[in-house]
Structures are given as structure tokens and as C-alpha cells.
A protein has these predicted regions:
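Short, compositionally stereotyped local motifs that mark structural "simplifiers"
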Residues: 757-864, 879
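Carbohydrate-binding surfaces of carbohydrate-active enzymes
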Residues: 263-487, 579-580, 731, 747-752, ...
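Extracellular beta-rich ligand/substrate-recognition surface
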Residues: 329, 340, 556-562, 719, ...
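Aromatic, loop-rich ligand-recognition surfaces of beta-strand-rich domains
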Residues: 861-926, 937-979
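Extended substrate-binding grooves/exosites of carbohydrate-active enzymes
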Residues: 41-351, 357-364, 374-378
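Short glycine/proline/serine/threonine-rich loop/turn segments at secondary-structure transition edges
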Residues: 17-32, 404-410
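Beta-strand/loop-rich accessory regions of lumenal/periplasmic or secreted enzymes
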Residues: 24, 400-406, 447-756
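Short coil-to-beta strand junction motifs in C2/discoidin
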Residues: 27-28, 363-368, 591-596, 903-911
């Protein structure tokens, strides 16, 4: 028909085309449609055919099949171009996203450049397109524009302009109404407008309450893993999409695997989007070019808020990417690729099961590479062709050798990447490259570890001890000095290996990673762990057997609120082996610690690193899924990672040994765990934790004048969010009696001898839990341990034993070689304790039936809690709860664990009292709890009395709430400090 000027005509065409291939992110089939006006003016557009539906169980179906959306949020940002990203950068972003098994992008928080959607159509990515409705700072306030009628038109128009512009892109499967801008009627109007025009895509908005009819799915930001699991158990037809999770600020992405497992546990948990894809940093060049008060500049840095004199700012809070601003990948990127991968492997009973986790794509033409790991040498490779595996199905194949069935095995699979047929072996570096290229892989540790057996020499070289401070020990080709009982100098041959001023020292502080926000205030502010230093006493040195000397010292730390005491023992052999045993007892149990171990410095020239442990990138107890155990070769500079704000990095879990050398030289120093069954956590960097923490940007780091070696018994997990939940409980590290053993040697042969032939029997630490069960723990697992109770007969330790009160003495039996006496016995006296299981609630001002019983406060489970009444009246503050311990107990403080799932009912002002009859009370402590990080994750409160008290009953009076106006109080756990 004729179209008048300014007019509009809508034309509908219908035609059947047989054999059309549908579009999915896995199979991005596109068709080119060209339309013209009178054959003169023409346009072309790519289209894809696909459907999006919601199933009765809450699953989202693409073309009739349930899909998990493995997503990431993406801002348009580049350090050189700012928000105006060139097309080639957009394409590189999409290539990186696809290469790391991400199938979904949330356009946060505005529609992106049109070309980006073309790329998503072509490469295959699901997209949540989001309207530019962002009023973060004024939502849910008197200025909330989502509730102002004058802003209704803006909300509707911004949403509809997004829909009209991008409606023909098959990649867009969700419309999002905006971000964190309130949940008023203007968003309901926007929802109604979209639905009237396009009802083919589900609607999302994170601010509406769950179940709200204006959107088709529930949503949340930064929930803890257990909450995701609980949402998945709800019986509803509404999908749940976690629009922001795994906040990737700095050294982050802990417990990422557990989030994916939670998504896969329920049909309605359709997935989520990591926050976020790329650091929003800016490139800053030499000093004076915009950087605010810079230190002497030595190169290019990633600038963030505040470095340009801008006030206010959010510092590095926009540097949350799994890749850096310059598009370099990180250990976070590797973890995402591994956890999001579309194949799963299970080794069992000599067979390998391969599961296809794609939703639409069959595994066709895939090759399987089976790599038997032989750390330190080349790894044998065998190929196997996989039969075609349909989506969601699996096949099981027989592993061809006994070594593959029980040994350390790497399984890799891909259809595009092919190893040449003549390649029968891979070096560690080649395996790293293949794993990076392959679509999916899995490492299976050996099911049975073969312990090396090295015969001890019949005669050890002589060793001499020169008394004084320092004590000097000399043997064949080496000398070692011990100042104040700690190794302060070491010379192997002609090489001095301990840097003057950097002796071996105890360490319980790491430069906080961004995700340590939940505990940083406590660690640095209250506990002052960065100031911890040890004082040594009772230093003893002697030759204890032919060719063996021992130096021992008692220590107690000062400068920090949490202190440690214990013993260090150095066993020095005439051949240069030095075996260290450290027993550390904290002044308080159960305090969160970022790390615990030792540190020392070596000359800067020894910057080449070889190690047997998890790698090839850095890993932590909750971010290690993408790693495998091998001998890796790297450098100190390569173990450093250029986060925009320097912080802890470079950690390697399960490290058996690390060797340090100058470039193109043999290793001069070998450092290993004391036992193959007690690997260490190790990092080797140019900087101390304090230096990393003090440098707020890369250009402010000091000169590279040393190498710092950190040997840890443990490090805290990274956690999954700097603005949300702390690390999972299983990845947290708490103060407790801790043994640490390690070995230094000049050669690998002597290191192996030290660990397998000349093992020093390390006497155990002695620990007792709240129920009175005593455990003995040695830094040499498997060692035979002896003990006596109250000076009674000697017993062999086999399992924890009950001790309500008394003295325990524990020691190690003689080692296998018979050449080395055990380290000195440990002794501990324990006051009377009755476990929480024997306690009873004496009284409570009120309780909430079923969900908030008073006895939940002493049940040992922090996931349950006493909640004052709210369904049968709301009494308001003050509240009280009293406990009967069943007998008189001597204690020095109490522990209040707040409710952990949310910041509700938190107690501010309190009074703690004790009684011998349960009626007459004596006030012991009065004060106010301090919360360093309230949002979503209150901190455990540990209150010391200053001097011991003795009583049978105790009572906590809650006098005021943290949040003004709250009426209820909650207590997850109440306990006492007995030592």
C-alpha cells in the first residue's frame, strides 16, 4: 500500500521453510533476511529461530529444553577508550567469554552498543538486556523516583526503547527492567508496556519481592550458597536467577564451585551472573598525568577512584572483573572456565564416565586425552576417540592401564584442539598449554600415594655448635646461625641464602584481599595481627647425637590482641639438612585468622621458582578446582599478579617442596614440608604482606630488593564476595593449637632424604574441644604419638579421648631411622569443662516457638538461633537468657555468636553476669558489642573479662539493639572461654 509522508504501515508475511535449524547459544544458527522498498531501498538483518518458555517446575526452556544460564555481568569499559569501546574490543570480549564456557551476559546496567548484540547472535550467547533505569542512591527513600508519577513516562520509555531497538536479536532471552532503583509502580507500568508488545521473553528485575507478578522470575544479589540451595527447594513454577553473585574484586572467586552445584541442584535455580567481566580501571601513564599525589612512577598502572584527585570516590570498588582492564586473564578466569565447563568426568572402578552437560549440543567428534602425571618428568599421553554423546547423557569407557586407574591422571577433551599423533609425552608446560586450549578437563589425584623410602646413611657428617647469640652450627659445606632461637643466616657452599634482617619469623597476617572486608577491621583494628612479633626465651643448643644438633626456644608473641606461645625446635644435620618443628598455641581459640605460618627473606637474585604443588596459577582452599598437582617452573615476578590494589596473591596449596635459584643456575635452596603427608601452603613474592598492604596502587610498591618466602600451615579462603557473605565455614581458618613442620636443604637428594629417610619425630600439639575431647596433632602425620594423663602410665595415642580436667603430656616416638631423638614433649593443663551438650537453659525472657527456642543458643549449631517472641507478642528490649552449666566452671570470658543469615536482632549494649545459685547475680562485664562488618554477615563477639571467674550459672542481658526501633533479640550461640 501507499505510505503517506510520516505514515507507518505494518506488513505481515507468512511462509513455511522446511529444515530450519533453531538458534541456541550452543548452536547459533542464523539466517539472513533482506527486505526492500520498491526494490530501491533495502535492509538486511540476521535472525534466528528459538523459543523461550517457563516450565511447571520453574526451569527456563530454550527450544523446549531446560538451560542453566552460566552468566557474567558486563560493563562497557576499557582502560584506554573508557565507555566508547571499539568493535574489535567488543569481539575480543565475546571471544574471551565464549572461550571460558560462559553462555550468558547481563548488560549491566544499560543497553549495550548494537554491534555487541550482533556478536552475541553470531557467536552464541544468551543475553539479559537491561534498561537504563538506575537510581541506586535514592531507591527506597523519600526521593525514590520509581514511586513518583512524574517519572513514570521515563521508566516506560527507557524500557520500550530498549525493546524496540533490540527485539530482533535471538540472543536476547530476558528483558530486565533496570537495576537497584526501587520497586514502585513505575516499574510495574514498564512491565505492563513490555508485555503488551512482547510476551515471548521472561521479565526480570532484582528489586521486586519474590513472587511479584510484574516479573516472571525471582532474583537476588550476593546470597550465601545455603540460601541458594534453600530457594531451590521451594515448590514453585517461578525460575530464580541470581543476577549478581561471585563478586570478583581483586583476588577473589572463592567457593565458586559450590554456587554452581547449588544451581544444578534444582530446576528452578536457572543460574546467575558473576559480578563482573572486566575491571573498570583506567590506564595511567607517567607521574603528573592525572595520578593523585603519586609516588615515583615506574611504568603503567591501573588507576581507580581517588587517583585523579576525585572526591568522593569508591576507590577500586569498580575493579571487579574476572579479567583485567587490559583483557589479560586471571586465576579467576581459569576457575570460571573449569566450573562452567560442559563436560563432567568420574573415575571409578577402573573406568571413566564422561557426561555431556550441554543442553542442545551433542558431543560429536571429540577426542579424549589421558595424561598420566609423573611430576618432575614428562607425562605419558594416550588418545581415545569418544563416541557421540547426546545432551545430558553419558558414556563409560575402560581406562587402558592400571596407572590411569589409580594414579595421578589428567583427562582432557576437545573437538577442535588436536594433539599431533606423534606426540606421546607432554612436559608440564605443554600440559598447561593443552589444558588452557581444551574445552574441558579433570584432574584425578592418585588414589594410593606411594611414599618414597630413602635409606638413611650409616654415618652422618660431623656437626659442631658454637654457643652464643647467635648460636652457630657448622657441618659439611654449610653453616647456620640462630639468633634468639630462629634461623637468621644460612650459607650453603659459597651462597648466603637468608637475607640479613629477614630471619625466619612467625606470621599470622596476610595483606587483606578485597573479599576480606568482612574481617579486615577485626584483624587490623582490634586484633592488630599485622603488628605481631615474637619474643624468644630459654634458647638451648647442643649436639644430641652423632652428626645431629638441636636448637630449641620457647616463644610468646606480642603486639597483637591475639597472641601465640609455644616452642620451635631446629634439628640440624651434618650434611646441611635443617628440620624445623613449630608448635603454636593461641591465647584464644576460635578466632578467625587470615593465615598462620612462618616467613623469611632471601637475596633478590634467587628469583627462579620450581615447586611440586597445585598450579599452574595461584590457588586457595576455596579456589582450586581448576588446578592440578605437578612440578611447575616459574619466576617470582610471574607469581606476582597485577591487581589494581596490591593484596595477597601467589598462594600454592598442597606444596611438597619449592626450589629457589638464580637464572640459568641450579637451585641453591630447597624448602619442603616435613612429611609428604603434610604439604604446606607456599607463596614466593617480592614483597612482605605489610608492603603489599601499604601500596595502594602498583606504582607505589617498593623496589624489588628481596624475595619473601611464606610457608603456611593454613590460609583463609578467599570467599565469594567483598560485599556479601564471608567464606564458607569449611574454608574458614580459626585459631587453634597448630603444628608446623618444614625442611631446608641444599639439594633435592638431601631434601628427599630429610622427608623420607631422616624424618624428625615432631612431638604433637595438644588440643581440647568444648566437649572435653583431647586431640594430639603432629606436623608429621602418621607419626606414632605417646601421652600420659596426670603423670599416669604411658599410652599410645589412637583417637581423641575425654578429659574433663587435668594435665596431658604428649611426645613423639623415636623415628624410623633411629638416629634422631623426638622433639621435646608438650604439656598442657586443662581446667574443668562440661560440654555444651550437658548445659541447660535456666531461663529466657521469651522465645519464639519452633523457630527460635532458647536452647538453640547452646546447641553448638550456629545455623539455629534463639529468637525472642514475636508471634505471641513483641516484648521489646531488654531481653535475657540464662544458662546452667551443671557444675562450677572457671572461665575468662564469653563468646556471643550473632544470627549469621541476616543482620536481624543483633545486640548492641549488654551485661554479662554469673551466679552460684541461679538467683543472686554478680555483674562481670558490661559493654557494647562492636560489629566490623554488619551487612549480611555479623562478626562473632569474643569478650574477655581480664581475670578469671568461677560460677555454675551465667546470664546475658541484651539491653539495646544495633538497629534503632528493633524489638527482638537473637543469639545463635553462647559459650564461655575456658583457656
Amino acid at each position: 500500500p501507499a505510505i503517506p509522508a510520516g505514515g507507518e504501515v505494518q506488513v505481515s508475511l507468512k511462509k513455511e521453510y522446511p529444515g530450519v535449524k533453531p538458534w541456541t547459544a550452543e548452536t547459533p544458527n542464523l539466517y539472513r533476511v533482506t527486505y526492500s522498498l520498491n526494490g530501491k531501498d533495502s535492509r538486511s538483518v540476521n535472525i534466528g529461530f528459538r523459543t523461550v518458555e517457563i516450565a511447571d517446575d520453574g526451569a527456563v526452556l530454550v527450544n523446549g529444553k531446560a538451560v542453566k544460564f552460566k552468566g557474567v555481568n558486563r560493563h562497557e569499559s576499557h582502560p584506554d577508550y573508557g565507555r566508547a569501546i571499539p568493535r574489535e574490543v567488543m569481539e575480543k570480549d565475546v571471544q574471551i567469554i565464549k572461550a571460558h564456557n560462559i553462555n550468558t551476559v547481563r548488560c549491566s546496567h544499560y543497553p549495550n552498543h548494537p554491534y555487541f548484540y550482533d556478536l552475541c547472535d553470531r557467536y552464541g550467547l544468551y543475553v539479559m538486556d537491561e534498561a537504563n533505569c538506575e537510581a541506586h542512591g535514592i531507591r527506597n527513600s523519600g526521593m525514590d523516583i520509581s514511586r513518583k508519577p512524574s517519572w513514570k513516562k521515563a521508566h516506560v520509555e527507557r524500557n520500550m526503547s530498549m525493546v524496540h531497538r533490540s527485539k530482533n536479536h535471538p540472543s536476547i532471552v530476558f528483558w530486565s527492567l533496570g537495576n537497584e532503583s526501587g520497586n514502585g509502580p513505575n516499574f510495574v507500568a514498564a512491565s505492563e508496556a513490555i508485555r503488551a508488545y512482547d510476551d515471548t521473553r521472561p521479565l526480570h528485575y532484582c528489586e521486586f519481592p519474590h513472587g511479584h507478578k510484574a516479573v516472571d522470575m525471582d532474583s537476588a544479589m550476593y546470597p550465601p550458597v545455603d540460601r541458594v540451595e534453600n530457594w531451590g527447594k521451594q515448590k514453585t513454577s517461578r525460575p530464580f536467577f541470581v543476577c549478581e553473585y561471585a563478586h570478583s574484586m581483586g583476588n577473589a572467586l572463592g567457593n565458586f564451585k559450590e554456587y554452581m552445584e547449588a544451581f544444578e541442584s534444582s530446576p528452578r535455580m536457572v543460574g546467575g551472573a558473576i559480578w563482573d567481566f572486566v575491571d573498570q580501571s583506567l590506564r595511567a601513564n607517567p607521574a603528573g598525568n592525572g595520578i593523585y599525589k603519586p609516588a615515583p612512577f615506574k611504568g603503567v598502572t591501573q588507576a581507580y577512584g581517588g587517583m585523579f584527585g576525585d572526591r568522593p570516590n569508591q576507590a577500586n570498588f569498580c575493579d571487579n572483573g574476572i579479567i583485567l582492564g587490559n583483557r589479560n586473564t586471571t586465576a579467576k578466569t581459569k576457575e570460571v572456565k573449569k566450573v562452567y565447563q560442559y563436560m563432567a568426568f568420574v573415575r571409578k572402578d577402573g573406568s571413566l564416565t564422561v557426561l555431556n552437560k550441554y543442553f542442545h549440543k551433542p558431543l560429536k567428534g571429540y577426542a579424549l586425552y589421558l595424561v598420566s602425571l609423573a611430576p618432575g618428568g614428562n607425562h605419558a599421553v594416550e588418545r581415545m576417540a569418544l563416541p557421540e554423546i547426546a545432551p545430558g547423557k553419558s558414556v563409560t569407557v575402560k581406562l587402558p592401564s592400571a596407572a590411569m586407574q589409580t594414579g595421578s591422571l589428567m583427562v582432557l577433551a576437545d573437538a577442535r584442539f588436536k594433539l599431533p599423533e606423534d606426540v606421546k609425552e607432554l612436559s608440564a608446560k605443554q600440559l598447561e598449554h593443552v589444558a588452557d586450549e581444551c574445552e574441558a578437563y579433570e584432574w584425578f589425584p592418585a588414589t594410593v600415594e606411594k611414599e618414597a623410602s630413602v635409606k638413611a646413611p650409616a654415618v652422618l657428617p660431623a656437626v659442631s655448635v658454637r654457643q652464643g647469640d647467635p648460636v652457630v652450627v657448622q657441618g659439611k659445606g654449610f653453616s647456620a646461625s640462630f639468633k634468639d632461637g630462629m634461623l637468621s643466616a644460612l650459607r650453603y657452599g659459597s651462597q648466603d641464602l637468608i637475607l640479613p634482617g629477614c630471619p625466619v619469623a612467625l606470621q599470622a597476617y596476610r595483606s587483606p584481599v578485597d573479599n576480606d572486608a568482612w574481617i579486615r577491621g577485626k584483624v587490623e583494628g582490634k586484633m592488630k595481627m599485622q603488628n605481631m612479633k615474637a619474643e624468644y626465651s630459654d634458647v638451648k643448643a647442643a649436639v644430641i647425637s652423632p652428626g645431629v644438633a638441636r636448637i630449641t626456644a620457647q616463644f610468646r608473641t606480642k603486639g597483637s590482641d591475639l597472641s601465640f606461645s609455644g616452642e620451635v625446635a631446629w634439628t640440624v644435620f651434618g650434611n646441611g639438612i635443617i628440620n624445623a618443628s613449630v608448635r603454636m598455641y593461641p591465647s584464644a581459640k576460635g578466632e578467625e585468622l587470615l593465615r598462620l605460618g612462618v616467613t623469611f627473606g632471601i637475596p633478590a637474585a634467587y628469583d627462579q621458582v620450581e615447586y611440586l604443588g597445585l598450579g599452574p596459577w595461584d590457588n586457595y582452599r576455596d579456589r582450586r578446582t581448576s588446578c592440578w598437582k605437578d612440578v611447575f617452573r616459574t619466576s617470582v615476578d610471574d607469581m606476582f599478579f597485577a591487581y589494581s590494589r596490591p593484596q595477597d596473591m601467589g598462594n600454592r596449596m598442597e606444596t611438597d617442596w619449592v626450589a629457589l635459584s638464580k637464572p640459568k643456575a641450579a637451585p641453591a635452596l630447597w624448602v619442603g614440608s616435613a612429611s609428604p603427608r603434610a604439604p604446606l601452603e607456599v607463596s614466593v613474592l617480592r614483597y612482605t604482606p605489610k608492603e603489599l598492604n601499604n601500596a595502594k596502587s602498583l606504582d607505589r610498591l617498593p623496589e624489588k630488593d628481596k624475595v619473601i618466602v611464606n610457608l603456611d600451615a593454613f590460609q583463609m579462603g578467599l570467599g565469594g564476595s567483598s560485599c556479601g557473605p564471608r567464606p564458607l565455614a569449611k574454608y574458614q581458618t580459626l585459631s587453634e593449637a597448630t603444628p608446623l613442620g618444614f625442611v631446608l636443604a641444599p639439594t633435592s637428594a638431601l631434601l628427599n632424604l630429610a622427608r623420607a629417610g631422616l624424618g624428625v619425630p615432631h612431638s604433637p600439639v595438644i588440643e581440647r574441644d568444648g566437649d572435653g575431647m583431647v586431640s594430639l596433632v603432629s606436623s608429621t602425620p602418621g607419626a606414632e604419638m605417646k601421652y600420659s594423663v596426670n603423670k599416669g602410665p604411658e599410652k599410645t595415642y589412637r583417637k581423641p579421648f575425654k578429659l574433663p580436667e587435668g594435665e596431658v603430656r604428649a611426645w613423639a616416638a623415636a623415628g624410623k631411622s633411629g638416629k634422631v631423638p623426638p622433639t621435646s614433649p608438650g604439656e598442657r593443663k586443662f581446667p574443668l569443662v562440661k560440654g555444651q551438650g550437658e548445659w541447660k537453659i535456666l531461663s529466657a525472657s521469651s522465645e519464639e516457638p519452633d523457630t527460635g527456642f532458647a536452647h538453640f543458643a547452646i546447641d553448638g549449631n550456629p545455623d539455629t538461633y534463639w529468637h525472642t517472641s514475636y508471634t505471641n507478642g513483641l516484648p521489646g528490649f531488654p531481653h535475657s537468657i540464662a544458662v546452667d552449666m551443671g557444675t562450677r566452671m572457671k572461665f575468662t570470658g564469653f563468646i556471643y555468636t550473632p544470627r549469621m543469615d541476616k543482620d536481624k536482632g543483633l545486640i548492641s549494649q549488654y551485661t554479662f553476669s554469673v551466679s552460684d545459685d541461679g538467683q543472686n547475680w554478680k555483674e562481670v562485664k558490661k559493654g557494647q558489642f562492636t560489629y566490623h562488618y554488619i551487612r549480611k554477615d555479623p562478626a562473632v563477639q569474643r569478650i574477655d573479662f581480664g581475670k578469671p571467674v568461677e560460677a555454675r550459672y551465667f546470664k546475658l542481658d541484651a539491653r539495646s539493639p544495633v538497629k534503632g526501633g528493633e524489638q527482638s533479640a537473637t543469639v545463635a550461640e553462647l559459650n564461655i572461654i575456658t583457656q
